[in-house]
Every structure is written in C-alpha cells, then in structure tokens.
C-alpha cells in the first residue's frame, strides 16, 4: 500500500516543480470553472484530508510561496483532537487543527471544506446516517468560520 504521507521537503519540491512547469495550484472552489469547461489553463487541484496540524505547519507557507491555493477537508467534531479513526490500525495519534488554526489556514489563502462530523466510512454507512454526517459538518464549519 502506498503511503498517504508526503514529507515536507518532498511536498515543497512537488509544488516548485508544478510552478516551474507553469501549473497553478488551486483550491476546489477555484478549480470548478476549469472542471466545468468555463476556463482553460494549466491547473491542478490541491487537497488535504482530515485537517492535520502538520498541514498548517508544513504546507501553508509553501503554498503561499508559489501563490497556490488548496482545500483542506476537516472532520468538524474532531477539531483540536487527534485521528481517532486510525488508532485501531496502530497508527500513532496526530493532532488535528482547531478552529483558531483553521482561521490561520484561511488567512494564508487556503480553503476549508467539510469532510464529515466524525470521519465515518461513508461507503459503509447508509444514506440515513451519512446525510447528517455531511450536512451537520458543513453547517458547523460555516457557523464557526464565517
């Protein structure tokens, strides 16, 4: 299985390479006109999953350096906590951003998106349970961040 982890130096090199090749890194909101065919250009969508503190610590400055934007999909009910969904897999706890850190993320030119409330596996969750996970996460984030 491939790792989902990219070292800070590898990430910086990836962003530098994209920039040198003429690509513009975009958040999902900024990418949508390209996906709909309303705009053309050399673009790439940049996303982060779960809202780890290390995204803020390691990626925000690099993205800003290259004038790239990104979207970080966060787990609304676990902000300021850890990746509890990984504990059963033997993966070490890692801190997740809190609301203050998310505000810094946004202030650095990045975007926040809704993952779910509790990081449930939506492929194993019925529609009746998955809809509130998604909707309530979005509502909570909108109220806290706007």
Range-by-range predicted roles:
Residues 5-38, 142-145:
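C-terminal domain-boundary segment and adjacent tail
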Residues 14, 59, 98-101:
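Residues within well-ordered alpha-helices
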Residues 36, 55-57:
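Short N-terminal helix/helix-N-cap motif within the alpha/beta-hydrolase-1
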Residues 54-55, 122:
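Secondary-structure boundary/capping motif
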């Amino acid at each position: 299985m491939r790792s989902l982890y990219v070292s800070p130096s590898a990430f910086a090199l990836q962003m530098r390479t994209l920039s040198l090749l003429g690509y513009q890194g975009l958040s999902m909101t900024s990418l949508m006109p390209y996906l709909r065919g309303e705009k053309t250009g050399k673009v790439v969508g940049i996303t982060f999953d779960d809202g780890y503190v290390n995204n803020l610590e390691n990626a925000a400055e690099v993205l800003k350096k290259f004038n790239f934007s990104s979207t970080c999909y966060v787990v609304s009910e676990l902000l300021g906590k850890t990746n509890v969904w990984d504990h059963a897999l033997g993966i070490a706890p890692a801190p997740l951003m809190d609301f203050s850190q998310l505000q810094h993320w946004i202030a650095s030119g990045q975007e926040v998106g809704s993952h779910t409330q509790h990081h449930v596996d939506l492929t194993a969750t019925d529609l009746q349970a998955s809809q509130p996970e998604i909707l309530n996460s979005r509502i909570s984030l909108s109220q806290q961040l706007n």
